[in-house]
Amino acid sequence: MSDYMINSMQFLYLVASYLFGNILTAYIVTKWRHNVDIRDEGSGNPGARNMGRVYGKGYFVATFLGDAIKGAIVVSIAKYLFEDSTFVMLTLLAVIIGHIYPVLFKGKGGKGISTFIGGLIAFDYLIALTLVAVFIIFYLIFKGFTKPGLITIACLPLCMILYSYSIVTTILSALIIVLILYVNRE
């Protein structure tokens, strides 16, 4: 992405990434299996955690995988088509925004963690593995998932620097983290 300008094909890909993010696995699964809207069940969040609480572990896994694969698909295609890590990180941001604030669902989406995880694995599996190690350390300290998960996510910009990504790519990763921490603040 020379001079950090995007061309028309990249712009269209960003729009498509956002719209692809609008596909909410939890909504599709509950409509198909139970003919209900998951946003009217449990916490009202169309994400893996609410699916697990309302319908059980199998639904948690299905929703997590569906949303993670969504992020991985967007990032993998962007890596293949554009090869620029800054633009690829921008597509990850777009798909996450699409998941959190889906225009097709009047802005009521999930919290973006599953989509982030899948996209990050596709972006750079070494960073993902580093963050898994960080998560394990904090999991052993806190004995739960939420705090270690959020702390681990917050470590992404440090990993970006450690793995020699550009400052612009690192800033984009930090924006993703701020967004995810914001929607997971309660």
From Swiss-Prot:
GO terms for molecular function: acyl-phosphate glycerol-3-phosphate acyltransferase activity. The chain crosses the membrane at residues 9-29, 58-78, 85-105, 121-141, 161-181. GO terms for cellular component: plasma membrane. InterPro entries: G3P_acylTferase_PlsY (IPR003811). Its main location: membrane. Its EC number is 2.3.1.275. Pathway: Lipid metabolism; phospholipid metabolism. It comes from the Bacteria. It is found in: Cell membrane. Keywords: Cell membrane, Lipid biosynthesis, Lipid metabolism, Membrane, Phospholipid biosynthesis, Phospholipid metabolism, Transferase, Transmembrane, Transmembrane helix. It catalyses: an acyl phosphate + sn-glycerol 3-phosphate = a 1-acyl-sn-glycero-3-phosphate + phosphate. It is a multi-pass membrane protein. It is an enzyme of class 2 (transferase). One of its GO terms (biological process) is phospholipid biosynthetic process. Probably interacts with PlsX. Catalyzes the transfer of an acyl group from acyl-phosphate (acyl-PO(4)) to glycerol-3-phosphate (G3P) to form lysophosphatidic acid (LPA). This enzyme utilizes acyl-phosphate as fatty acyl donor, but not acyl-CoA or acyl-ACP. HAMAP family: PlsY. Belongs to the PlsY family. This is Glycerol-3-phosphate acyltransferase 1. It comes from Bacillus cereus (strain ZK / E33L). The gene is plsY1.
